[in-house]
Structure formats: C-alpha cells, structure tokens
Curated annotation (Swiss-Prot):
The lineage of its organism: Bacteria, Pseudomonadati, Pseudomonadota, Betaproteobacteria, Neisseriales. It comes from Neisseria gonorrhoeae (strain ATCC 700825 / FA 1090). Belongs to the polyphosphate kinase 1 (PPK1) family. PANTHER family: POLYPHOSPHATE KINASE. It holds the Pfam family PP_kinase_N. This is Polyphosphate kinase. NCBIfam families: poly_P_kin, PRK05443.1-1, PRK05443.1-2, PRK05443.2-2. Keywords: ATP-binding, Kinase, Magnesium, Metal-binding, Nucleotide-binding, Phosphoprotein, Transferase. GO terms for cellular component: polyphosphate kinase complex.
Length: 685
C-alpha cells in the first residue's frame, strides 16, 4: 500500500458517519417520530459540515492548491470527491423523507399537506394565518438600482419572486427578494379539526408560495422560488490586533452571518435562469448548487415530534440512576472524602456534579471554586451556582472558552453575567481552546485546606448530559486535585507548565503519553508478551498516532477501537493493520466518552479523557487525561466503556479497509447485545 493510501479522507469519513445516522432514520425498530429526529440531525450535521469543513477545503484550494495532506489528494480532488458523496447522501435523505417517512407518518394520521392537497377549510385557515401572522412581518425587497440584492443571513430561508407589472411609483420590476425571519416557524401546525382529528402541518414555504402576491398588490407573480445560502462560519480573531477578546468575538459573531457562500440550496423545480441568477449573486458555481426535492431546510422539522403528543411513536422516557450512597441529605464532600465517585452519564444522573457546585456555594467552609466552561447551554444551573458562590465572597475563577464553535454567543453572555457577579473570568489561553472539563473546590477542614475535583469526558451541560454518554470522576485524591490546581494556575497565570503527578495534558504531555503507551505495547508484543490496546473516542485522525498503531499491529498488538465519528485509519489491511478492528456505535444516545486502556502486561492502564485522537486535541487545545486507578472504578470503566461496546451487535457498525461500514448482527445462535439498553438496565438504579 502506498504512503498516500494509508490515511483516509477525513471529510469522506465524516459523511460516512452521517450515513450511519441516516440509517437510524431508516430503521423500523426506531420509533417513527425519533426517525424523523435522526433525519433532522443529519441535516444539522450537514449544515455544519459545509460551514466548517467544505469552507476550509475551499480556502485551502485557494491558498494552497497543490498541497497534498495526509490522504494524498489535492484540495480540488478532495472537493470533487466530497461533493459527490454529499450529493448522494442528500438525495438519499430527501428520498427517505418523501417516499418513506411521510407515508408512514400519514398512516399514523400525521400529515404534511402540500398546496395541491389543501381542502377548502384548510385554505381559508392558512390564508387567515398568513394575513395575521406573516403579512405584518415580511418585508419584500424589489431589485432595482436603488435596491441592490440583499445579503441573506447564513442558512436563512429566502424567496426569489418573479414579477410582472409596475408598482405604485411606476417602476417596472422583474424580481424581488422576500426574506423569512428566523422567528417564524418553518412548519405550521393546523388545528386538529382541519386534519380529521389527527395532526397536520404545512411548510412555511408553501404558505408563502400561495400568498406571496399579497406583498405585491397590483402586480402579477410569475414565480416564487425558495433558496438558502450556507456561508463559511469560521471565526477568526487576530491575537496581535485584539485588546478585548470578548468584544472581538462579539463583532466576529455578527460578521460570521455574512461569510463567503459555500452552498446554495434551491428546490428542484427552480428554473435554470433563476438558479444562474442566484449563483452569480453569491459568486458560486454549479458545483456548489444543491437542488432538493422538498423544503430547503429539513432541520426545522425537528419541531414536529414535540408538537405531536404520541408517546407510542417516541423513545420511552428513561430516568437516570442515582448512586445509593448519594442520599438527599448526604453532603457530597463527605462521601468523596471516603472514596472517589465515578459517574456514567446519562445512565447515571448529572445531579451530583451540579450538587457539588451548589453545596460549595452555600458551604461556609468552602473558600474557592474553579471551573472550566466549554459548552453549558442557555439554561444552566451550574453557572447560577457559580454566581451565588461569588456573591457569597468565595474566590470563584471560571475559565470560559469563548471560541467554542457555535456556542460563542452563549459563552459571551455567561462570561458577562459571571463577571457582574464578582467571579474572576478568564478567557483561556489565546491560540489554545480550553476543552478540558474540570472543576475544583477548596475547603478548610480541621484547620487545613482540602481539595475536591471533578474531571469529565463531556461538557458541563445538563441538556447534553441526558443525551451524550460520558464519564465523570469526583475525587479528593491529593495528587490529582493538586494537578487540577496546577492546570488552573497555568491557564489563568503566566509561566512555564508545572510538573503533574498523575494527569496528562495537552498540548504538553498527552500526545507523548499516547505514543509512548502504544510503543510500550509494541515492545511487549515483540517480546512475546500479551499486548492489547482498547480505546473509545469520537474521532481518530492524527497521523502520527495512526502510524504508531500500524506499527503496533505489525508487531502483533491486538487493537480494538470504538470510534463514533471520523476515522482515517484503515483497519484490517494485511501487512499494515490486520490486528486493528474499528467499530462505530450509533444509537439513541450520542457516544461521547473518551476512554483509553493499555494492557501493560496485565496492569490495564486506564484513562478517561476530554481529548479525541486528533491533531487539534493534542496540539491546539488544553485537554486532560485522568488515570482511573481505584480497582472497582477501573473495572467499571473497562466494562461499561469498552467491553460492553465491543460486544454490541445491535447498533454497532464495523469499519472496512476501504473506509466503508457494515452493520454488526448477532451470529447464529448468539443473543442480541445492545450497549445502550444494557447500560440503562445496569445503571438506572
């Protein structure tokens, strides 16, 4: 195999992940309304794919057209491959929505009504709705020398309206643009009595098509064509020109809405001359045009399951388990002082993490609280608890990562509120995203200071903690808590990195540790000792780690990798990676935990980490890897995080040498193993 073929294309691998997500929308074992949600997730993922990865490829093609990255292809070649794969995925997605999901939903009396199928009473209600809810809000923009083509917001819904006639001022007009504000719903529910007692929805685009003429009185509407522009959403801040990072990011957030276009979506009924006109306005080519058979934004269909009261068509609710030791009246610090606590979300409640900060805020023995925030959502109980602690005159330090992609606005808002409450807010280290998930509480106990720390694989986000699978460790281990304190001092202050006792950190020691542990397993295999690596992560694309894994495989190390998303390593290639197996698990929960286990001659060195095996995590972010050494906790991490995932034959996909995936299935006589359901049964309490 040539050097160029040893590494797969990361963008194609990311699209392959979205094909696995789309398979959930096809799976008849998944409740029907949840299948619709998975369809929407794919659309949301594709939006981000174009905003970030395709935008990066376009910039790379412009700046370095001859450069060949790890996969050996020039940017233009990769763009062509990725465009073809994206078109195939999008066609499949719309075919699934139009020809499978809509008919199945209709059989459950959940209808998406097209204009041609509206009844008389539905037409009357829709017209009244337009007059009452839409007409006062919409502002048409006629195109003439005094009204140039407007700049549509990123991913906004717009309409190109063809007109015939003259307006009140005698101006002839051939074209106007109507922008649909984001506050408007993209699907409008009809009253049940108009839908035979079931649920009915109409698309905003259909309502506008039917009544757009009311925006142009006295003129003839010849055509109305929806379009949606996706823009480059990279957010860049020049370190040398920035005096106030928060203010600079606020400015960049506005500018991001108007980045360069990377994709134009139109309905497949849009005439060629309108397509060409729009492409010219946005300086795009036919290669960046996507014609879809249906509404140009399927993401907003995610509102439908919440509007339909059909529990039988949704996942049954789960209640996270709570550790028996964590009684309602048991102070968490008393428990952690006795032994560390391992939490596995969402199967076990995130509440102990919130309780830790809440108790710290109210505890007179607590002197200081420190915490990182990467993503925490708009409705956080943790941030108000930190504010309460600051208002109680405790020393509160919060490292807020303002550059967390697509959460920048939330984080700017929280940072402002924390500062107003008296917290010491730090925006990390310029040039390095603070992706580590860590919190530290310092108490005075019996006249001495005692530290308590939480370290996790996932964000301090109560919303995603109910969906994402993650591990968290709450510990009073003196060496680990001292390390966490050192990391906070590094981030908030200046000076050289401190020496850590147990933790590994990016960008200094984590990559070396991973490479070193792989090399040690390689040497063990060469010496005839048992050698094994098992790891779970979201993405694996860092080339030096991949090459180290190839060397380990060649030496006989048995390697099992559970990689949910991107993986550019080729498994199962004779002479290269025949001892490497890669699987991806896609189910109801989003697999998000990062767990590494190196056999080490039977010692099973085990870590939970905030870092995937990507270049950005190793070299451009501040990350942590925490060793799990307590025997019972290590046993749990290995079993729940790795062994049960390797046994899954229900939601697992097995990666092939060419980068494709096939679905795992029980062998003849083998019982079904479902990682996520089995973990709910094990941990819900």
């Amino acid at each position: 195999m040539t050097e160029q073929n040893r590494i797969l294309c990361r963008e194609l691998s990311l699209l392959a992940f979205n094909r696995r997500v789309l398979a959930q929308a096809e799976d008849k074992n998944v409740p029907l309304l949840e299948r619709l949600r998975f369809l929407c997730i794919v659309s949301s993922n594709l939006d981000e794919f174009f905003e970030v990865r395709m935008a990066w490829l376009k910039r790379e093609n412009k700046l370095h057209p001859r450069r060949r990255p790890d996969n050996g292809k020039m940017p233009s070649e990769t763009i062509a491959d990725v465009t073809e794969a994206a078109r195939s995925l999008i066609r499949h997605q719309y075919d699934l929505f139009n020809n499978v999901l809509q008919p199945e939903l209709a059989r459950e009396s959940i209808h998406f009504y097209r204009r041609r199928n509206w009844t008389g009473t539905q037409k009357k209600w829709i017209e009244d709705y337009f007059d009452r809810e839409l007409l006062p809000i919409l502002t048409p923009i006629g195109l003439d020398p005094s009204h140039p083509f407007p700049r549509p917001l990123n991913k906004s819904l717009n309409f190109a309206v063809e007109l015939d006639g003259t307006d009140a001022f005698g101006r002839p007009s051939g074209m106007a643009i109507v922008q649909a504000p984001r506050i408007l719903p993209r699907v409008v529910p009809l009253p049940s009595e108009l839908c035979g007692g079931g649920h009915g929805f109409v698309f905003l685009s259909s309502i506008l098509h039917a009544h757009v003429g009311k925006l142009f009185p006295g003129m003839n509407v010849k055509g109305c064509h929806q379009f949606r522009l996706t823009r480059d959403s990279d957010l860049t801040v020049d370190e040398e020109d920035v005096q106030n990072l928060r203010a600079a990011i606020q400015n960049e957030l506005h500018d991001r809405e108007y980045g360069d276009g990377v994709r134009l979506e139109v309905a497949d009924t849009c005439p060629a001359y309108i397509r060409d006109f729009l492409l010219a306005q946005f300086r795009l080519t036919d290669a960046e045009l996507y014609q879809v058979k249906g509404p140009v934004n399927l993401v907003r269909l995610n509102a439908v399951p919440d509007l339909v009261n059909r529990p039988d068509l949704k996942f049954p609710p789960h209640t996270p388990g709570r550790l028996k030791a964590l009684g309602k009246n048991s102070p968490i610090f008393d428990l952690v002082r006795q032994s560390p606590i391992l939490l596995h979300h969402p199967y076990q409640s995130f509440d102990p993490v919130v309780d830790m900060i809440r108790e710290a805020a109210a505890d007179p023995a607590v002197l200081a609280v420190k915490m990182t925030i990467y993503r925490t959502g708009t409705r956080s109980e943790l941030v108000p608890a930190l504010m309460k602690a600051a208002l109680a005159d405790k020393q509160v330090t919060v490292v807020v990562e303002l550059m967390a992609r697509f959460d920048e606005a939330n984080n700017v808002n929280w940072a402002k509120q924390l500062e107003e409450a008296g917290a010491h807010v730090v925006y990390g280290v310029f040039g390095y995203k603070v992706h580590a998930k860590m919190a530290l509480v310092i108490r005075r106990e019996d006249g001495v200071l005692k530290r308590y720390a939480h370290l996790g694989t996932g964000n301090y986000h109560q919303g995603t903690s109910r969906i994402y699978t993650d591990f968290g460790l709450i510990t009073a281990d003196e060496q680990i808590t001292a390390d966490v304190n050192t990391l906070f001092m590094e981030i908030t202050g200046l000076g050289k990195p401190g020496r850590l006792n147990k933790l590994y950190q990016s960008p200094f020691t984590l990559h070396k540790m991973v490479i070193g542990r792989i090399a040690r397993e390689t040497e063990h295999a060469k010496a005839g000792k048992p050698a094994r690596i098992t790891a779970k992560m979201n993405s694996l694309i860092e080339p030096t780690v991949i090459e180290a894994l190839y060397r380990a495989s060649a030496a006989g190390v048995q390697i099992d990798l559970i990689v949910r998303g991107m993986c550019t390593l080729r498994p199962g290639v004779k002479g290269l990676s025949e001892n490497i197996r890669v699987r991806s698990i896609v189910g109801r929960q989003l697999e998000h935990a990062r767990v590494y286990c190196f056999h080490n001659n039977g010692a099973d060195d085990t870590f939970i980490s905030s870092a995937d095996w990507m270049g950005r995590n190793f070299f451009r972010r501040i990350e942590t890897a925490t060793p799990i050494t307590a025997p019972e906790l290590k046993k749990r991490v290995i079993r729940e995080g790795l062994e049960m995932a390797l046994a899954d034959n229900t939601h697992a996909w097995l990666m092939q040498p060419d980068g494709g995936y096939i679905r795992a299935a029980p062998a003849e006589g083998e019982s079904e193993a479902d990682l996520q359901n089995d973990l709910w049964d094990l941990l819900r309490g």
